[in-house]
Design a protein with these regions (language model features):
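Extracytoplasmic/secreted cell-surface and envelope-processing proteins
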Residues: 23-25, 217-221, 239, 243
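Short amphipathic alpha-helical face segments that pack within enzyme cores
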Residues: 102-108, 221-228
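Short, gly/Ser/Thr-rich active-site loops of penicillin-recognizing serine hydrolases
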Residues: 133-142, 223-288, 297
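Beta-lactam-recognizing serine transpeptidase/beta-lactamase-like catalytic domain environment
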Residues: 1-215, 264-267, 284-291, 297-308
Length: 308
């Protein structure tokens, strides 16, 4: 048995417990499909990823965005040389390594899973002056390179995540969901919290994905954010008010600011903050008034004690 985050188990329970071992071995097997030529194996994988809209602009109506990164054979040949080894890319199997995805790409990828292999190009504009968006590209079904039958075990695994896996604390009594937790490790500081979900499980109406920087485990923060949004959309109200209050009362700015300071120091552009003179004056005035108030209270107490 291989120890560590779930072991090398079959697909469904590996999705359920987010097994790094299983997915690393699966990715390694793909790279080793062509002995001595891992570039060919990673190119086959990259081609499939591109068909989900990853590693490229989605051709949507957003003015800004990022292609992210799906590394191919040329990428690794440039980085490690033509004789690079599969183990140098194995971390891609667990979603780490050189893979870069945007939140909208994660949501779109999840929508393709819900549809068993196709997706509409995501867009913001639904209608103009009450008329449907005339852009035909948003009405075309984009087919992925994965046969619909291969999505069934993935969907069962995402169902198990919520029923008895890493996302079980987010299960709702009012709607079913399919989900995947994610914890993107950061070299320094807390990890990024990632979660993506489909609801309802048997008749999908909404996909929600969230990435919360330096927040920790996926099910701890990004998961509650996603499930609260889905709940409001599907039910028209919030049944789990405690999740909403916990989210709106939280702040990750301290860790985010710390990471920013680390970055500035790394590139030699950090300058210690200079105390604002007006702010310091206000603090000093407040302390003076507080001291005067305390002295007044002390004097009154002394007078009271002297009274026969």
């Amino acid at each position: 048995r291989i120890k560590g985050h779930g072991g090398a188990d079959p697909l469904i329970p590996s999705i359920q417990v987010s097994s790094n071992c299983y997915f690393s071995y699966a990715y390694l097997a793909m790279l080793n499909k062509y002995p001595g030529n891992p570039s060919k194996g990673v190119d086959e994988w990259a081609k499939i990823m591109y068909s989900f809209g990853l590693g490229q602009f989605l051709n949507n109506d957003l003015a800004v965005g990022s292609k992210g990164l799906i590394p191919d054979g040329k990428f690794y040949e440039k980085k490690y040389g033509k004789n690079w080894k599969p183990l140098q890319a194995v971390f891609n199997g667990m979603g780490q390594g050189e893979i870069l995805l945007t939140p909208i790409q994660i949501a779109n990828f999840t929508a393709a899973i819900a549809n068993r292999g196709w997706y509409y190009t995501p867009h913001i504009v639904k209608s103009i002056d009450g008329k449907p968006n005339p852009d035909k590209r948003f009405k075309v079904k984009n087919q992925t390179l994965v046969d619909p039958k291969h999505f069934e075990p993935v969907i069962r695994g995402m169902e198990a995540v919520v029923l008895r896996g890493t996302g079980r604390a987010l299960k709702s009594n009012d709607f079913t969901q399919l989900a995947k937790t994610g914890t993107a490790q950061v070299p320094q500081g807390k990890d990024n919290s990632i979660y993506t979900m489909i609801a309802p499980a048997d008749n999908p109406k909404i996909v929600v994905a969230a990435v919360m920087e330096h927040a920790g485990f996926g099910a701890t923060w990004a998961g509650p954010a996603c499930t609260v949004i889905a709940e409001k959309y599907l039910l028209g109200e919030l049944k789990r008010e405690h999740l909403y209050k916990r989210l709106t009362g939280a702040s990750f700015m301290a860790e985010y600011n710390r990471q920013w300071v680390v970055h500035l120091k790394k590139i030699g552009r950090y300058e210690p903050p200079k105390p604002d003179s007006l702010a310091m004056k206000k603090i000093q005035d407040s302390l003076r008034l507080l001291n005067e108030k305390n002295k007044t209270i002390d004097n009154k107490n002394k007078q009271t004690q002297k009274t026969p």
